[in-house]
Amino acid sequence: MARMLAVRVVAGLAAAAVAALLLEHYGLAGPTTPLPKPRGSQRPHPAPGSEANNIFWGLQISDIHLSRFQDPGRALALEKFCSETIDIIQPALVLATGDLTDAKTKEHLGSRQHEVEWQTYQRILKKTRVMEKTKWLDIKGNHDAYNIPSLESIANYYRKYSAVRKDGAFHHIHSTPFGNYSFISVDATQRPGPKRPYNFFGILDEKQMEELVEFSKKSSQSNQTIWFGHFTTSTIMSPSPGIRTVMGSATAYLCGHLHTLGGLMPVLHTRHFTGTLELEVGDWKDNRRYRIFAFDHDLFSFADVTFDKWPVVLITNPKSLLYSCAKHEPLERLFHSTHIRVLAFSLSPITSVTVKIDGGDIGQASHLSGPIFILKWNPRNYSNGTHTIEVFVQDSAGRSRTAHHIFSAQEDAHLTFDPLASFILLTDHYIVARVLFVLIVLIQLTTLITFRYLAYPELKEPLGFANMTTFSLHILSKINISYYSVLLLTLYTVLGPWFVGEIIDGKLGCCFSFGIFVDGHFLQGGLTFINGIIQLVFFNIPLMAYVCWSLLHRCFGHSFRSHLHQGKYWKIIPVYLLILLLYIWQVYSCYFLHVTYGSLAFTFSPLRTWLTLLTPVLIYRVWTLNSTELGIFMVQLKSHLSS
């Protein structure tokens, strides 16, 4: 009866957890306001040709991380970018997509807003007069929102020192003689903004989503629309229908945040199911990367380049096949174009622009106007299959650069993005983290409860690894001190609170696996679930395994000292090395908590500080259990070994 009850409880918890996750992700919303549909086929003309019209270009820079403690070269390079680079490229607008400042403490673990970093940022903008040369659109990143109790707080230096100085999303329209182009910002920074690390994920609420839907509707009158934000869509938590659906009519979403995963993924680009491109740009902080993009006859092109590397080259026609989408762009204009078109910029005058297709030299492009170079061609000559265009640019100082990509003059041709990049950008990682967290907890609880109510084992087969593991789980689950300790630890990891402290300076809050309560606000969990998984996998479960292992040794009649002198050091030493490393990690997590959230959080942290202190107590208690408590298991082992 008890066994059936336990099974029903676990099954009910599993079903409830899965249902809750699905409902939260997909919602039970009724009919929603229709979103603008992607642009359909447009007129084939005007097509890219021999005139210097229907084209403009801009720049994107992200993750600048101006710091009062780290790498002053970031500020020096940014100043040069705002003067020299802007003067040469002369963009119509610049998108600065977040993390303008670093906002970390000297030891690089804690976080707070440093006014001097923001003053440095503003000084650069004013000194270079960059806002007089171009439209500088800067938005906040998660670092710019560290430790900010409210948007009205004096610590919200973005309002005082940025170029835009307006919190929240906005819709900028770039007007040209040949049409309007919409640039819609997404501000998913958390409100209020907790200290690091728990604001890694962005959050959009219902009101913010409604505002973005309105922007999307208004942008339907524009030639093309670009969305830009700090967070990748995979790190934004948003209610139904989801941020990707809302921006579904856009040509591209330009973002930063992931720093190309520390260089492991130098190209993080993909395409949404709506056809919208998602393009993460490399960080300025360590890699000095930026992006040049252009609309040439409403065809979108871009190139990610390294600061101070000249020439900068962008082929605008024919555009790259990988980044083409008939849903959003008039690709038929490419098929009716009369000229190959290239943008080339350098410190010195451009002297030659050589064009090759499929390895064959087809000629020298001639200078049209400004940075625009053109070369007559016939796209019908390349109407079959895919082809590679290569452009070699050289300036008068001998600097050179080659740009190349695959293109096609067929409407039905397409290429696929890197599957790993698509997984990183298209997966809602907070949903995956929640599901994994729940599954790990359910597996651990099911194992504990099942073995608790199973009949005592009978050892009939040889003592192999599987038999010993099963036997040790029986011991763990049927000895009260070990069973309730592990059960309580698992349940507490789920229910919390993990700690109570100053989530924001002067604002008390509680951190749970499912989110953070601070100053009357609830911030839903994203990174908290990931930390919960790490806690389970790298401490709770190994501790449970070690307790099982220790209890098994006790049943063989060993004490803590005697089991160390069995002579089987090759079996024992790896166990203790692993446990020691994991315990050191737990101790470090206490130190990290103290540095990031202060002494109060360190003191009132059951899952960190208290657990670190209680773990040796549990281990001592296990190794000093009376033989009477282990009696039936010791008898079974002796009986089996003597038979």
UniProtKB/Swiss-Prot annotation:
The keyword Membrane applies. Signal peptide: none annotated. Keywords: Glycoprotein, Membrane, Transmembrane, Transmembrane helix. The lineage of its organism: Eukaryota, Metazoa, Chordata, Craniata, Vertebrata. Glycans are attached at N180. One of its GO terms (molecular function) is hydrolase activity. One of its GO terms (cellular component) is membrane. The keyword Transmembrane applies. This is Transmembrane protein 62. It comes from Mus musculus (Mouse). It comes from the Eukaryota. Its main location: membrane. It is found in: Membrane.
